[in-house]
UniProtKB/Swiss-Prot annotation:
Assembly, per entry: F-type ATPases have 2 components, F(1) - the catalytic core - and F(0) - the membrane proton channel. F(1) has five subunits: alpha(3), beta(3), gamma(1), delta(1), epsilon(1). F(0) has three main subunits: a(1), b(2) and c(10-14). The alpha and beta chains form an alternating ring which encloses part of the gamma chain. F(1) is attached to F(0) by a central stalk formed by the gamma and epsilon chains, while a peripheral stalk is formed by the delta and b chains.
InterPro entries xrefs: ATP_synth_OSCP/delta_N_sf, ATPase_OSCP/d_CS, ATPase_OSCP/dsu
Main function: F(1)F(0) ATP synthase produces ATP from ADP in the presence of a proton or sodium gradient. F-type ATPases consist of two structural domains, F(1) containing the extramembraneous catalytic core and F(0) containing the membrane proton channel, linked together by a central stalk and a peripheral stalk. During catalysis, ATP synthesis in the catalytic domain of F(1) is coupled via a rotary mechanism of the central stalk subunits to proton translocation. This protein is part of the stalk that links CF(0) to CF(1). It either transmits conformational changes from CF(0) to CF(1) or is implicated in proton conduction.
One GO CC term on file: plasma membrane
Record keywords: ATP synthesis, Cell inner membrane, Cell membrane, CF(1), Hydrogen ion transport, Ion transport, Membrane, Transport
Superkingdom of origin: Bacteria
Family designation: Belongs to the ATPase delta chain family.
PANTHER family in UniProt: ATP SYNTHASE DELTA CHAIN (PTHR11910)
A single GO molecular function term of this UniProt record: proton-transporting ATP synthase activity, rotational mechanism
Cell compartments where the protein resides: Cell inner membrane
Record's protein name: ATP synthase subunit delta
Amino acid sequence: MAERSTLARPYARAVFELAGDDATERQAWSRRLAAVAEVVQVPQLASLLTHPRISAEQLAGIVCEAAGDLGQTGENFVRLLASNRRLQYAPEVARVYEELRAEAEGIVDVEVLSATQLEDAQQERLAEALRKRLGREVRLQTRVDESLIGGAMIRAGDTTIDGSVKGKLARLSSALVH
């Protein structure tokens, strides 16, 4: 994963710089990159991406046609990835681009794992508390993980807050052993 991220980062940065400060252009690139990422993950196409007998131009043509309206700059980007034999990294390019975009727009993606489904009001209170703590806009992604027993685990970037019963029991067990 680290290698994929390392290879994808320069492409994502280049696209991000190309989009500039224009919110409409940033959104357009998000759409383009997502479309290309989706296409290259189709199993029938994924096997062709590294096939030595298929030219970069052929690959670019297939991906551009399948991805739909990418515009001239989007198609040029696909050709660049294809000529460098990096089309298989398109999903990672899209992911890194979205990270750069979120950072520039002052948004942090927060993953919330809870033992039970959070109600809308709980999600709103949690988002507000995280906004205050992190000093940025928060984009919540919630999932249910019954193995937590109760409570929740929150991940925002490099920060993890474990308020789950499972986590508390693990810390208690560790304290008793030591």
